[in-house]
Amino acid sequence: MKIFVYHTPEETPTENMPDCAIAVDVLRATTTMATAIYAGAEAVQVFSDIEELMTVSEKWSADKRIRVGERGGKKVEGCDEGNSPLNFTSETVKGKRLFMTTTNGTRCLKRIQNAKVVLAAALVNRRSVVEYLKENQPETIWILGSGWEGSYSLEDTVCAGAIAHSLLAETNSLSDENVGNDEVFGAMSLYLQWQDKLHELMNHASHGQRLQRLECYEDLKYCSQIDILDVLPMQKEIGVLS
């Protein structure tokens, strides 16, 4: 195995796709995806733009779909829900498909949609991702942060570090030959420094501060929890995870 960490979709190579690509958007898209699928959603279908989401979702009956739209941390007008994972309970989502577009996370998934295996990871389902990687041992792994509109994010980097460190430590693979770029060491170092203070780190992060201004305090607490959901959102067809 060789692991690469990229802080934003824009940083990834354009010529080759890895054996396994992992999208991370801790605040909040991949946390929401993991939560919704764990709660019984039929699938999550991602879109880069709102117009396409509305057009495609119109083909589904209203009682079988949930339109999820977020821009700048706020719910998009015309959508049923914004991007708060706390809204996606089993009562809300069971048997329904989420049609989802967000500022950063869905763009991240679009960038890697042609990889052999595409996963969605957050802190809440870190363990499920690590166990999949240990079992399947993909030759090349990209862990791709969503960032914020093309910029670095603390929360996605600490999650990438949590995945990379657990995987390499538990497979006795913590050597240079398994590390594809410097960003892997940087991400692992961030995680090891903050692993017992993840909620505090979220509050320091620029997007965490943005969500505080929107009074999304409970979202920040929830997204900071690690290994609480045994769920592995995986792309089954282009743009559709379940």
Swiss-Prot record:
It comes from the Bacteria. InterPro entries: ComB-like, ComB-like_sf. Keywords: Hydrolase, Magnesium. Its EC number is 3.1.3.71. SUPFAM superfamilies: ComB-like. The keyword Iron-sulfur does not apply. GO terms for molecular function: 2-phosphosulfolactate phosphatase activity; magnesium ion binding; sulfopyruvate decarboxylase activity. It catalyses: (2R)-O-phospho-3-sulfolactate + H2O = (2R)-3-sulfolactate + phosphate. Its cofactor is Mg(2+). Belongs to the ComB family. PANTHER family: 2-PHOSPHOSULFOLACTATE PHOSPHATASE-RELATED (PTHR37311:SF1). This is Probable 2-phosphosulfolactate phosphatase. It comes from Trichodesmium erythraeum (strain IMS101).
